[in-house]
A protein has these predicted regions:
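PLP-dependent amino-acid enzyme catalytic core
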Residues: 1-494
C-alpha cells in the first residue's frame, strides 16, 4: 500500500510522496506529514557494512514508495557522489565523551547538502512521473545555509527557477558571499531588510496566495519549496541517523539494540524531526536532545508546553538557529495530538493571531523522548575552545551549541548513554567565530580568519570557500520584507 502524506491542517488533503515533493507546502498552509510509518528492516549486522548509498536506498524506498527502485537508484547515485569530499559521505568522529556526525562534507560545507543534493533529482523525477509541463519555481527563505545548498543543487537544472530570500544582516560574510556569487542562469538571490522569520512568513504567504497561484498557473509556473517544509528535504535526513548508528555498531562502540542519544542544534526543527522519524522506524533512540541558542523558544516549549514567539529576536554567532517560528515543530505537534489536523490547525492559527499556544492534551510518550536546553553566546565560545583544547578539533558555532547543551544535559541527568552530536557545518563557514573562540583574537576579517583557521586546524581549505574572496558578486538586490512578492513577480515576469 502506498504511504499517505497528509496535511497537518486538513485530514482530507492527502497526497503520495512524489506529489508532496512537487507541491512543497499544502495549499491550506499545512505541512505534508506521514500518518503512519513504513516497516523498515534495520538489521545492523548487515547495515554496519553498508555504504551510505545503500542505507539511503533502504530508508528512501520505504518513505518514498511511489518512486521505483530504478528512479531511486538514479537519484541516490547522482546525489551522493564526488560532490562529497569523502566516500563515507557523513563520517562519525569520536571525541572525548561524544561522537560528532560530520554532515558538512558536501559542496557547500553544511548539513543542508545532505538533502539538497538529492532534492533536485527527486523533483525532476516526480515531475516526469506526473507529466508535469509547468516550470517549477523553488521559493525559499534561508537563515544562511539552505539558500546556498539549494542553489548549488538546482543551478541550471532544466525546468526550474530558484529564488532565495535571506536576512541582510542575519548571515555570516562567508554565507552571504556563497549565495551572492552563485552561478546558474536560473538562480536568483534577494536580501531583505528583516530577519529570517520575516522571510519565512512571507514565503509561506506566497505559497498560500490563491490569486498568485492562479497567475503562476496561467504562465505555466508552479511553486515548490527547498525548505525542510518539503518532505523531500526531510526524508533524506533520516538516512544519516541510521548510518551513524550503523557506524557505532561497526566500530564496536555499541551493540546492535543499544539505545543512543542524539543532540541536534535546532532552529526550524527539521533536523531533529528526522531523528524522531528514525526512531519511529525502529532506530534504538534514547533521548533526542534539542539544542537552542539564545533564541530559546523551543527550550521553553519543551519545558512549559507553551510556545510563545512574542520575545526579542537575537542575532547570534549561530545564525542558522536564529529563528522564533520553528516551522517543522508543526509536524511534531500533529503527532503529539494523535494526527488531529483540526486541533493542529487551531494551535497554528493561535500562533499566527496571538503569538502563542499551549499544548494541553498530548501524547506524553512522544514528548518524553525529547530533552531541551540552550547555550548562551559565552557558553558557545567556551565550548569551541574546550573541544579544541581537549581534542585538537574545531567545531562550528552551531555544533558547539549542541556540544555545550549535551554537557548540560549530562550534568543534569547523569545519562551515560552514548551520544551523537549532529555536526551541522564546517568551522570554515564561520571562521571569525571559530578563530576568536580558540585564540582570543578579535577584529579579523572573514578571509584573515580563514587563513588562521587553516593554520590552527591543519584542515585544507574546502573548495566551497577557497577563492570566494575574488569570486564576482552576481546578486545585489535588497528589498523590504513587504516587497518580497513584488520582487518574485518581477523576476518571473508576471
Amino acid at each position: 500500500m502506498t504511504l499517505v502524506y497528509q496535511s497537518t491542517r486538513d485530514a482530507k488533503n492527502t497526497v503520495t510522496a512524489s506529489q508532496a515533493i512537487l507541491q512543497g507546502l499544502a495549499t491550506d498552509g499545512g505541512l505534508f506529514t506521514p500518518v503512519s510509518y513504513p516497516k523498515v528492516d534495520l538489521d545492523f549486522d548487515t547495515l554496519k557494512d553498508a555504504s551510505y548509498q545503500e542505507v539511503a536506498k533502504l530508508v528512501l524506498s520505504a518513505f518514498l514508495d511511489d518512486f521505483t527502485a530504478e528512479e531511486l537508484d538514479y537519484c541516490i547515485t547522482n546525489a551522493y557522489d564526488s560532490k562529497f569530499d569523502t566516500p563515507a559521505i557523513a563520517p562519525l568522529v569520536k571525541l572525548d565523551g561524544q561522537y560528532n556526525l560530520e554532515l558538512f562534507h558536501g559542496s557547500t560545507i553544511a548539513f543542508k547538502d545532505m538533502a539538497l543534493s538529492i532534492l533536485p533529482y527527486f523533483m525532476t523525477t516526480a515531475a516526469k512521473k506526473h507529466g508535469l509541463e509547468n516550470k517549477i519555481v523553488i521559493l525559499t527563505a534561508t537563515s544562511g545555509d539552505t539558500g546556498k545548498a539549494a542553489m548549488a543543487g538546482f543551478a541550471d537544472v532544466p525546468g526550474t527557477e530558484i529564488i532565495v530570500f535571506y536576512p541582510k544582516d542575519g548571515v555570516s560574510k562567508v554565507q552571504e558571499l556563497q549565495m551572492t556569487t552563485q552561478t546558474g542562469e536560473n538562480t536568483h538571490v534577494i536580501a531583505i531588510d528583516g530577519n529570517f522569520d520575516d522571510a519565512q512568513t512571507n514565503v509561506k504567504h506566497m505559497f498560500n496566495d490563491v490569486a498568485l497561484r492562479e497567475k503562476l498557473a496561467a504562465n505555466k509556473l508552479q511553486f515548490s519549496s527547498a525548505n525542510s517544509m518539503n518532505i523531500g528535504r526531510l526524508v533524506p535526513q533520516i538516512v544519516y541517523y541510521v548510518y551513524a548508528y550503523a557506524q557505532l555498531v561497526k566500530t564496536g562502540e555499541i551493540k546492535a539494540g543499544d539505545k543512543v542519544n542524539f543532540t541536534v542544534p535546532t532552529g526550524n526543527f527539521g533536523n531533529i524531526l528526522a531523528a524522531f522519524y528514525a526512531k519511529q522506524i525502529g532506530l534504538p533512540v534514547g533521548k533526542l536532545i534539542c539544542a537552542s541558542n539564545d533564541n530559546n523558544v523551543l527550550t521553553d516549549f519543551f519545558k512549559t508546553r507553551v510556545y510563545d514567539k512574542k520575545r526579542e529576536f537575537k542575532v547570534t554567532t549561530s545564525p542558522s538557529m536564529d529563528i522564533l517560528v520553528s516551522s517543522n515543530l508543526e509536524r511534531l505537534i500533529f503527532h503529539l495530538l494523535g494526527n488531529d489536523a483540526v486541533k493542529t490547525a487551531e494551535l497554528m492559527n493561535a500562533l499566527n493571531t496571538q503569538g502563542q499556544y499551549e499544548l494541553t492534551d498530548f501524547d506524553a510518550e512522544i514528548l518524553d523522548l525529547f530533552a531541551a536546553e540552550y547555550a548562551t553566546e559565552a557558553e558557545t565560545a567556551a565550548e569551541i575552545k574546550r573541544v579544541y583544547e581537549s581534542d585538537a578539533y574545531i567545531e562550528d558555532p552551531h555544533t558547539a551549541v549542541a556540544s555545550a547543551v549535551y554537557k548540560k544535559y549530562q550534568a543534569a541527568t547523569g545519562d551515560a548513554a552514548k551520544t551523537v552530536i549532529a555536526s551541522t557545518a564546517s568551522p570554515y563557514k564561520f571562521p571569525v567565530v571559530a578563530v576568536e573562540a580558540v585564540t582570543g583574537k578579535s577584529g579579523l576579517t572573514d578571509f584573515e580568519a580563514l587563513a588562521q583557521l587553516h593554520e590552527i586546524s591543519g584542515v585544507a581549505l574546502p573548495p566551497a570557500v577557497d577563492g570566494l574572496e575574488t569570486a564576482p558578486v552576481r546578486h545585489k538586490t535588497t528589498v523590504a520584507a513587504a516587497d518580497m512578492q513584488a520582487a518574485v513577480e518581477s523576476y518571473l515576469g508576471l
